[in-house]
Amino acid sequence: MALEDRCSPQSAPSPPHHHHSSQSPTSTTTVTMATASPVPACTTTTTTTSTSGASAASSPTRDEMSLVVPISPLHIKQEPLGSDGPMPAQPPHHHQHPHHHQLPHHPHHQHHPQQQPSPQTSPPASISFSITNILSDRFGKATAEQQQQPHPQPPAIREPISPGPIHPAVLLPYPQHVLHPAHHPALLHPAYHTGLHHYYQPSPSHPQPIVPQPQRASLERRDSLFRPYDISKSPRLCSSNGSSSATPLPLHPYHTDSDCSTQDSTSAPSPATYGDIASPSSASSAMTTPVTTSSPTGSVYDYSRKASALDHRAALLNGFSAAASYPKLHEEIINPPQVPGEADRIANEGGTGCGGHGCCGGSATPHNMPPLGSLCKTVSQIGQHVAGTGSLNGSGSAANGASNGGSGAPATAKPTPKPIPKPAPSSETNGSSSQDAGMESSDDAKSETSSTKDGSENGSNLWPAWVYCTRYSDRPSSGPRYRRTKQPKEKGDSEEKRPRTAFSNAQLQRLKNEFNENRYLTEKRRQTLSAELGLNEAQIKIWFQNKRAKIKKSSSEKNPLALQLMAQGLYNHSTVPLTKEEEELEMRMNGQIP
């Protein structure tokens, strides 16, 4: 059973009306294609009717078997790939590179050379409880889909598509990391499985293969970076698909919900760069991916959670912008579709390593998987907010935390940042009533908001406090500043409304003569003029001040700072109309005149 076709999506019970279901236990050869790697064909084992049937070099280990519910008489039926009828069992030596160019023309395979077809065998009546089938949302629907839409391509060997059970012959040796499901929680990481459904989300024209997990333990010696949860599944590295890996393949447009994963094969992040993990010919693998890619995130993320090898900054330094790279995924992260029962389900099932996704073999009963949207949301949040924490070996709790806050740590971090609190929150509601608590600390701000113009804009235009410290009229509150209206003083009505002094011609002539002699009065001269002309000293003093101001204004002797500010459009406090020259200068500096 463990060797029962690792890539076939048909491991669900086939509908009874399926016209090709041969109920006889035909023994088919599960052929795994290797890249041009000298390792001999290891998995050409014909699984007949026993679960623990004879197996070649990669017979299921006890770890694998614990991940699969043994189903005794296992009937293998041959699924047709197209109109060619059932596929003959491929001989083991068919293992070399016969079907290299068959799939690249298929529209949904997106020319990933990895996705080569393999003999699609599945038990007709017995349900295979391999974890990937249980978790995939195609559980029980695969064969129906396949019947409705036969494959366009001829029968070919369907190779193990990268997710996880990569054939050892295909993988490059990374001996320092030993993959063992028993003590490597990364193998059981729910992200691996959820990535799996993503990677094989049923596309309308053909069922994409789903690889059962059990074979994984037989690959302990190799670095099997399971592609479905390879870099692109980890939202931290969604963008590092294109950026970090040295794979020269183009990024293909995504066609599933949040298809970080359809691009997995292109920019393979694994050390053995999965460009062609399962591609039959060495030519394509050599062509697309350098054998030992210098992908920094590759070795870091093969196990996606190896605490010793995991440098959390590697992901961030590779530049993750989910919004830019995968808008749909980003949108799902930010606006997660809430599936009502999923949080409780995940929380109840969550063993530490297995994360309640049924990956421990003990819970091999099919779950009601919610639609992929929320699942993607939980998986994609695993990496995003926990990027800074230690290792995520409690992978289940990380997935749970994203959906129901079950994990400690920032897995429950909010996807969207809270807006910065505005300086005067109460003024949003108060509108024009400006004298609210937030503004009362700043005297200048009160004068701003108490003005009619700013008061009406206060609800929409809230500015930080430092803005109101500036004295220039270019402040964002716009428009000229308004001074606070002074409260009328009761005592000085006569002072405030003193009528304008009307000087007689004799008085004016005398004042002009004095002014021509000396523009500035001394106290003695002021007293003398006051006695002669019958005027107050204050009136004489003010007349001299006004006369000096008029002459200064007419001679255009402006303060250089005032001229500079006026040229920038900042100095509009003039109490006297501008002269022609000043208006022209200001308009020219403002760009209104060429």
From Swiss-Prot:
Bias type Polar residues, positions: 237-247, 426-436, 448-458
Biased composition (Low complexity): 22-60, 278-299, 387-402
Region Disordered, residue ranges: 1-64, 76-127, 141-164, 198-217, 231-299, 387-458, 474-501
Cellular location(s): Nucleus
Keywords tagged on the record: Developmental protein, DNA-binding, Homeobox, Nucleus, Segmentation polarity protein
Comp. bias intervals (Pro residues): 151-164
Record's GO cellular component terms: nucleus
UniProt record similarity statement: Belongs to the engrailed homeobox family.
PANTHER family hit by this protein: HOMEOBOX PROTEIN ENGRAILED, SEGMENTATION POLARITY HOMEOBOX PROTEIN ENGRAILED
Name used for this protein in its record: Segmentation polarity homeobox protein engrailed
Annotated source species: Anopheles gambiae (African malaria mosquito)
Gene (UniProt): en
